[in-house]
Structures are given as structure tokens and as C-alpha cells.
């Protein structure tokens, strides 16, 4: 419980520029922090977007279902009707080559899931072979409401061709 209190205090301080004891005159800054408060303009946009959330998630799911059914790879996301699919990932043998070929055809891909233990902040001497192998192979393909039917067909066709 003592640790929980310390963690809570640390998180509260980080949320407001690292400042502790914000209500008193004897505040201090013990760590680097940020200002995570949302301004009114961003909040207004967020409220409007929230009204569209179900519709947008359904579009993501529709695209993901097509990918799950039509992309001919053994290792890809399995369709789950409860997932929002803000990203859709696949595993390819040569990620760099796959991304270059897709880019030449006008399809943006991404690498969103680099293994955490390889970042400087978390760097350790631990070897996680499976995590590292997946980290070198995972790539995301477009899965957003701006895609039209021909975009989706092209992504499926070229993913099957280049993977």
C-alpha cells in the first residue's frame, strides 16, 4: 500500500509538469513531467468524434474481416468482432523488402510493435528470441475509414503478392 501511494503521487506529479503538492505553496519538482490536460478545443473535437465512434469502429471491423478472410498468410490477426482494429498487423518474412514494395505501389505500411525490451529506457541483457523474431517481422497495413473498396482490394492483392 505504501508503494501504491508513492506510485500514485509520482503519476500525479508527472501529469502536471512534475510538480508535487500543487495545492500548497511548498510544492516541488522531483521528476520530469508533462502537461496532460486537454484544452477546450481538443475536447470539443473529441466529443464530436465520440459520436462517430461506433460507426468508425464498424468500418475498421469490416476491413479487418476482409483482410482476415482474404490475406493468405498463416500469421495475421484473427478476426474478433469485439476488436476496434485501429491497426491490422501481419507477419512477413522480409519486412523491409515488403514495405519497400508496398510503398512503391502507393501503400503506406507501419512498424508499430517494436519489442519494448529493446528501447533504451527498458534495455536489458535479457534475450527474448521469439519477441525479437516477431519484432523483426511484424508490419501493419492500412485499416482506416478513408479506404475505399478498390484500395482494400489493392492492399489484399499486393499483400498476398509481396508477402
Q: How should these model regions be labeled?
A:
Residues 3-163:
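PLP-dependent aminotransferase class I/II
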Amino acid at each position: 500500500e505504501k508503494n501504491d501511494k508513492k506510485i500514485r503521487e509520482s503519476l500525479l506529479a508527472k501529469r502536471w509538469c512534475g510538480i508535487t503538492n500543487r495545492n500548497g505553496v511548498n510544492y516541488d519538482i522531483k521528476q520530469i513531467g508533462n502537461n496532460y490536460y486537454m484544452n477546450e478545443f481538443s475536447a470539443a473535437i473529441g466529443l464530436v468524434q465520440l459520436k462517430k465512434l461506433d460507426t468508425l469502429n464498424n468500418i475498421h471491423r469490416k476491413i479487418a474481416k476482409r483482410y482476415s478472410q482474404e490475406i493468405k498468410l498463416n500469421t495475421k490477426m484473427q478476426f474478433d468482432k469485439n476488436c476496434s482494429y485501429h491497426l491490422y498487423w501481419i507477419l512477413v518474412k522480409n519486412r523491409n523488402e515488403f514495405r519497400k514494395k508496398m510503398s512503391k505501389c502507393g501503400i503506406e505500411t507501419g512498424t508499430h510493435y517494436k519489442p519494448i525490451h529493446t528501447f533504451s529506457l527498458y534495455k536489458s541483457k535479457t534475450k527474448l528470441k521469439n519477441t525479437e523474431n516477431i519484432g523483426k517481422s511484424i508490419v501493419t497495413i492500412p485499416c482506416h475509414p478513408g479506404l475505399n473498396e478498390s484500395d482494400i482490394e489493392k492492399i489484399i492483392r499486393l499483400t498476398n503478392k509481396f508477402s
